[in-house]
From Swiss-Prot:
Keywords tagged on the record: Aminoacyl-tRNA synthetase, ATP-binding, Cytoplasm, Ligase, Nucleotide-binding, Protein biosynthesis
Residues spanned by motif 'HIGH' region: 122-132
Lineage: Bacteria, Pseudomonadati, Pseudomonadota, Gammaproteobacteria, Enterobacterales
Annotated family: Belongs to the class-I aminoacyl-tRNA synthetase family.
Catalytic activity: tRNA(Arg) + L-arginine + ATP = L-arginyl-tRNA(Arg) + AMP + diphosphate
Top enzyme category: ligase
Protein name: Arginine--tRNA ligase
Species for this entry: Shigella sonnei (strain Ss046)
Subcellular location: Cytoplasm
SMART domains: Arg_tRNA_synt_N, DALR_1
EC number: 6.1.1.19
Gene Ontology MF annotations: arginine-tRNA ligase activity; ATP binding
Matching Gene3D superfamilies: Arginyl tRNA synthetase N-terminal domain (3.30.1360.70), HUPs (3.40.50.620), Isoleucyl-tRNA Synthetase, Domain 1 (1.10.730.10)
């Protein structure tokens, strides 16, 4: 149930009946304050002048045509021409009942789309570090939300599995295998492995020459070199899968669509762009000049798609990637969770994609960029020694801190239960601290804040959920008994909680459209706060009679279900007790 969409359509029809153009925007928003109702329509300001009226005159005209019978108990004009809408308690009660009767909590299913989501994208032969965290968990929250809404989602893990460095890595792997026969390498070895390979490449000309030859052989499809390359990819992705599972993200090996996937397409794309007159030779390289992007001299910027030596660039791969996602995966929409520093690069690749007709304008290519993770000093998050923080080390520390926190509060908890709870709290805290911030901004990584039981944090939200569940344990009532009971809304706090519960679909819709999980976090935090106020002022177990008691239990029940489902769309685990 999307009340905002329902009201928007009703107000729009009334505006048209009052003389507004058919494309008018009613601008229905949640009211900022309770005294202004549940929703407010602000669209009169933009339209009134065109009709030769004041916004208030238009609002008065709109009210004569606005039929919200059975939806609103009161509609009034405020200020210069805002329309305040107060939802009818009977309408709220009816839709709370409907939400409780549905596994989806009354959330409708939009028209199904095929949506490709590009996220995580670690590099082969390197361990995942904190720089991969944001893309991985924000992208996964978007995927979970889109799937819940009923879309077909294709996860695309654009792994860095190709490039000239693989000659060097294969040469070093070969040397290691000869010297350490039978030893299986793990990724922890690969961190040092990469450094050692690079050191030899820089210092040993014979090794460097061999590495360069290996690149040529790998790129020509030689089976021995392909096998060595696959071994490096397998070692990396096996280790990365452990991290994905610890993070409770939904990526698997089946979702890997590395850079190498697009290699066979690159020569054809360069030839096609030349044939279309979009790409030209410039100083030996193949270049596309884009009028939309200017260099320092104010001339169209040249984007190289093939180097003088015949090698291809990331841009060429990204052009092929977009083409593949439309033509082969049949995407209706493509979302890229890549940091903001890549924005111009992506815009240039997509400008070429559009000019070449590889992806029509009707299929959105969206860069859902994000800022950086910073330390308390406001600088990029590093180890004390100034190095890159490995993601596995960060998760180990989260678990250790959560273990201490949980043990302090529950000294008698059995060890296995403590470990399970510490994992939910620790991993949840790291993820929620990131997801609760607007992805477009940088954010400060702070252990004390993220593990606090106050404020908009995972531990607070997990505790809020267990608090609602505890009401049911005390009530000793089964779900069948409760299902038959009516919902009655008489108190203001009951109405405020019910109205917020029924805004779950609106919140999901915003997250799906904008790729902004922080909107869901803000909604759930607000919901938990409203439940707190309701619980304090509207006695549940000691209500004046059974009818009121059961009605309030149903509001508590929908609160618990909404918190659990909302946190699940974020990939945050809930627990029964804390």
């Amino acid at each position: 149930m999307n009340i905002q969409a329902l009201l928007s359509e009703k107000v729009r029809q009334a505006m048209i009946a009052a003389g507004a153009p058919a494309d008018c925007e009613p601008q229905v928003r949640h009211s900022a304050k309770v005294q202004f109702g549940d929703y407010q329509a602000n669209g009169m300001m933009a339209v009134a002048k065109k009709l030769g009226m004041t916004p208030r005159q238009l609002a008065e005209q709109v009210l004569t045509h606005l039929d919200l019978n059975g939806i609103a108990s009161k509609v009034e004009i405020a200020g210069p021409g805002f329309i305040n809408i107060f939802l009818d308690p009977a309408f709220l009660a009816e839709h709370v009942q409907q939400a409780l009767a549905s596994d989806r909590l009354g959330v409708s299913t939009p028209e199904k789309q095929t949506i490709v989501v590009d996220y995580s994208a670690p590099n082969v032969a390197k361990e995942m570090h904190v720089g991969h965290l944001r893309s991985t968990i924000i992208g996964d929250a978007a995927v979970r939300t889109l799937e819940f809404l009923g879309h077909k989602v294709i996860r695309a893990n654009h792994v860095g599995d190709w490039g000239t460095q693989f000659g060097m890595l294969i040469a070093w792997l070969e040397k290691q295998q000869q010297e350490n026969a039978g030893d299986e390498m793990e990724l922890a070895d690969l961190e040092g492995f990469y450094r050692d390979a690079k050191k030899h490449y820089d210092e040993d000309e014979e090794f460097a020459e061999r590495a360069r030859n290996y690149v040529v052989k790998l790129q020509s499809g030689d089976e021995y070199f392909r096998e060595m390359w696959r071994k490096l990819v397998d070692i990396t992705m096996t280790q990365n899968q452990i991290t994905y599972d610890r993070l409770n993200v939904t990526l698997t090996r089946d979702d890997v669509m590395g850079e190498s996937l697009y290699n066979p397409m690159l020569p054809g794309i360069v030839a096609d762009l030349k044939a279309k007159g979009l790409a030209v030779e410039s100083e030996g390289a193949t270049v596309v000049f884009l009028d939309e992007f200017k260099n320092k001299e104010g001339e169209p910027m040249g984007v190289i798609i093939q180097k003088k030596d015949g090698g291809y660039l990331y841009t060429t791969t990204d052009i092929a990637c977009a083409k593949y996602r439309y033509e082969t995966l049949h995407a209706d929409r493509v979302l890229y969770y890549i940091d903001s520093r890549q924005h111009q690069h992506l815009m240039q690749a997509w400008a070429i994609v559009r000019k070449a007709g590889y992806v029509p304008e009707s299929v959105p290519l969206e860069h859902h960029m994000f800022g950086m993770m910073l330390g308390k000093d406001g600088k990029p998050f590093k180890t004390r020694a100034g190095g890159t923080v490995k993601l596995a080390d960060l998760l180990d520390e989260a678990l250790e801190r959560a273990r201490r926190l949980v043990a302090e509060k529950n000294p008698d908890m059995p060890a296995d239960e403590l470990e399970k709870l510490a994992n939910a709290v620790g991993i949840g805290a790291v993820k929620y601290a990131d997801l609760s911030k607007n992805r477009t901004t940088d954010y400060i990584f702070d252990w004390d804040n993220m593990l606090a039981f106050e404020g908009n944090t995972a531990p607070y939200m997990q505790y809020a959920y267990t608090r609602v569940l505890s009401v049911f344990r005390k009530a000793e009532i089964n779900e069948e008994q409760l299902a038959a009971a009516p919902v009655i809304i008489r108190e203001d706090r009951e109405a405020q909680l019910a109205a917020r519960l029924l805004q779950f679909e609106e919140t999901l819709t915003v997250v799906a459209r904008e790729g902004t999980p922080h909107v869901m976090c803000a909604y759930l935090y607000d919901l938990a706060g409203l439940f707190s106020g309701f619980y304090e002022h509207c006695p549940i177990l000691s209500a004046e009679n059974e009818e009121v008691r059961n009605s309030r239990l149903k509001l508590a029940q929908l609160t618990a279900k909404t918190l659990k489902l909302g946190l699940d769309t974020l990939g945050i685990e809930t627990v029964e007790r804390m």
